Amino acid sequence: MGGLVMQDVRIVRFDMLVRSGKLAKATAADEGMNMLTKPEKVFFHNTNLMYCLTPMTSVGTLRETYLASQLAVGHQLSMPEQGDLVADGKWLFEVGGKSKGFSQIKGIENSFVVSDNIEIGYDTKIPLWLFGLLY
């Protein structure tokens, strides 16, 4: 019985971190967004927190974390089979660097490449920094 209570406490504490804005979570695409749903992926809300725990964080992880933190404020995030993130079950995002192409999300409706180190977007390629304006 004690194990079940501890699990409930962990779930409530995790949910408090998500609601307080310290963490963002993305569930599997086919699951609902409730407190008891195990997240597929957990993101820090602030990329600076990542450096406190792991100074050698990969650039790709930082990019995904930044995008998730900006989208999580007004959208529900889920993990797709292809791509990196889905917002509100509708918009698919693939995150990468300047040379990131469309091959991983080719032919998927409402899909976008979010690229770091570009100033201006074109077609369905969006600069990563632009998502900072959503916040």
What do these predicted ranges mean?
Residues 54, 98-107, 121-123:
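Active-site-adjacent loop/helix micro-motif of nuclease/hydrolase catalytic cores
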Residues 71, 85-104:
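Conserved catalytic cores of phosphodiester-cleaving nucleases, focusing on short active-site segments
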Residues 1-83:
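Accessory nucleic acid-recognition modules appended to NTPase machines
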Residues 119-135:
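Domain-level recognition of nuclease-like catalytic cores that cleave nucleotide substrates
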Residues 58-59, 106-108, 126-128:
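Short, glycine/charged-enriched secondary-structure capping and boundary segments
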Residues 89-92, 109-113:
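Hydrophobic beta-strand segments of well-ordered beta-sheets in folded domains
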Residues 116:
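Short, positively charged
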Residues 35, 86-91, 122-124:
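Short, solvent-exposed polar/charged micro-motifs at secondary-structure junctions
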